[in-house]
């Protein structure tokens, strides 16, 4: 185990329109309040040494490889030039086994791209990101992860004074659809080519010498996003702000500000306070994924064909695969969630009917599948309805047709149905306690969420449904 970071910065091989290397903005009284020992170990770093020297994670020490990224983004459908307005990339850490990851500080102070903001972050949203990213990782869904949260000792203004904080975020890269939009809008075709080559080298190195590598690269991004969004849908996750600057080329999730997990099932569920039109509602997420990928394809058109018509045909060939790939991943996953492990004709209709019953009876999304997994049929809110009994009979008949013992079906179903998710009211309680200086509830919920498929846990976080006394709203915390 090493105590040293091994930073490089291949991103800086791009033209300097892609980044800013401005000064750091130190804080006077940093305190480490959350740390991810397991992540540190996976990066080949000694956790204790990092905890004892927090100046780097507090943004008080600059690296030779640090920079802030420029990018654009369609925010609720409107294209805007953006950039890391409150983030500093420390560099690309290369682990002892050769894996390359970005290490970024969020809330580290103003940059060239701050647009008048203070560049800081509040403690509550950083704790939320830490919790949600760890939950997503444990669920097996590709995601950036949080290494640490530093409380800065400074107050910042966000609808009143809040504790300032800095999150250390680790990701396969921070290349976004919005990075390509920036290259196409503020740069030249040569800049788009250079960025694409960097992305291929980083995420799809097997394509480096492929003659049609740009088309294949687009196809790889399509595949990764189709799988990611299908996985979100399968656990009832609502991102809340699926702007193009929040879509990673790597296929990892990022920016867990206004996100939440669905309690009561309804396809039109929206949590984000700023999504007034429901653009990023649960049911819309697959379509927004397709829309965002079309924006990526637009930036790559000059690389995809000799003529515009040829390029559009090539792009459309890859984009049309998205719906097929998404549906395959989603409906296969949904079948697994109800114990069907080889899909047959009629299975999609069976799962569709289940979702209709869940919506009409205001069933809890996670607990419905948990009850089916455990065979606790009487706890289902539609169990006594006529159409509910019809569905349960059809489901049982389909299960029996597989020829597997019930205990084997239940055991396998547990691999697809988490016993616990980050319940919104529990996350809020942890955040509120953290804002009072008590991080015990955060550590407690993290312990549970890091083992989400463990049905043997005895905890209030596992089986307790949400209170129905208020509509839950999330805020980005910017």
UniProtKB/Swiss-Prot annotation:
Active-site positions on this chain: 245 (proton acceptor)
Keywords: ATP-binding, Magnesium, Manganese, Metal-binding, Nucleotide-binding, Nucleotidyltransferase, Transferase
Lineage of the species this protein comes from: Bacteria, Bacillati, Bacillota, Bacilli, Bacillales
NCBIfam families in alphabetical order: PRK00029.1
Disulfide bonds: none
GO-annotated molecular function: AMPylase activity; ATP binding; magnesium ion binding
Binding site for Mg(2+): 246, 255
Gene, per the UniProt record: ydiU
Described purpose of this protein according to its UniProt entry: Nucleotidyltransferase involved in the post-translational modification of proteins. It can catalyze the addition of adenosine monophosphate (AMP) or uridine monophosphate (UMP) to a protein, resulting in modifications known as AMPylation and UMPylation.
Cofactors, names only: Mg(2+); Mn(2+)
Name by which UniProt lists this protein: Protein nucleotidyltransferase YdiU
Listed InterPro entries: SelO
EC number(s) on file: 2.7.7.-, 2.7.7.108
Class of the enzyme per the UniProt entry, highest EC level: transferase
């Amino acid at each position: 185990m090493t105590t040293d970071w091994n930073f490089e910065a291949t991103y800086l091989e791009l033209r300097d329109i892609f980044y800013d290397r401005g000064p750091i903005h130190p804080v006077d009284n940093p305190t480490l309040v959350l740390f991810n020992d397991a992540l540190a170990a996976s990066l080949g770093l000694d956790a204790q040494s990092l905890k004892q020297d927090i100046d780097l994670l507090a943004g008080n020490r600059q690296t030779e490889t640090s920079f802030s990224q420029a990018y654009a983004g369609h925010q609720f459908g409107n294209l805007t030039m953006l950039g890391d307005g409150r983030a500093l990339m420390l560099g690309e850490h290369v682990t002892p086994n050769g894996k390359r990851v970005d290490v970024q500080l969020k809330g580290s102070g103003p940059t060239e791209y701050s647009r008048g903001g203070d560049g800081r972050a509040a403690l509550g949203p950083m704790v939320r990101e830490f919790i949600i990213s760890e939950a997503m990782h444990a669920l097996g869904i590709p995601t950036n992860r949080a290494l640490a949260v530093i409380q800065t000792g400074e107050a910042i203004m966000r609808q009143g004074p809040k504790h300032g904080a800095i999150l250390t975020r680790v990701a396969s890269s921070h290349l976004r659809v919005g990075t390509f939009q920036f290259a196409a809008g503020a740069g030249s075709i040569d800049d788009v080519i250079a960025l694409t080559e960097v992305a291929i080298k980083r995420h799809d190195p097997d394509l480096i010498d492929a003659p049609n590598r740009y088309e294949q690269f687009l196809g790889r991004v399509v595949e990764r996003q189709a799988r990611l969004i299908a996985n979100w849908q399968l656990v009832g996750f609502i991102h809340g702000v699926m702007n193009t600057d929040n879509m990673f080329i790597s296929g990892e999730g990022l920016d867990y500000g206004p996100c939440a997990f669905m309690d009561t099932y309804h396809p039109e569920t929206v949590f984000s306070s700023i999504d007034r039109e429901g653009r990023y509602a649960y049911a819309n997420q697959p379509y927004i994924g397709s829309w965002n990928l079309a924006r990526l394809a637009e930036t790559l058109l000059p690389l995809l064909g000799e003529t515009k018509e040829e390029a559009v045909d090539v792009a459309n060939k890859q984009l049309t695969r998205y719906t097929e790939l998404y549906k395959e991943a989603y409906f296969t996953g949904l079948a697994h969630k109800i114990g069907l492990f080889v899909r047959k004709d009629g299975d999609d209709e069976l799962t569709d009917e289940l979702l209709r019953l869940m919506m009409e009876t205001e069933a809890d999304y996670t607990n419905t599948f948990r009850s089916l997994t455990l065979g606790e049929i009487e706890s289902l809110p539609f169990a006594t309805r006529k159409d509910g009994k019809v569905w349960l009979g059809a489901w049982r008949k389909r299960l029996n047709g597989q020829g597997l013992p019930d205990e084997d079906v239940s055991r396998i179903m547990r691999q697809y149905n988490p016993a616990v998710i980050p319940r919104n009211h529990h996350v809020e309680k942890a955040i509120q306690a953290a804002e009072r200086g008590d991080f015990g509830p955060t550590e407690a919920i993290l312990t549970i969420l890091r083992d989400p498929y463990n049905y043997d846990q005895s905890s209030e976080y596992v089986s307790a449904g949400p209170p129905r006394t208020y509509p839950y709203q999330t805020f980005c915390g910017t």
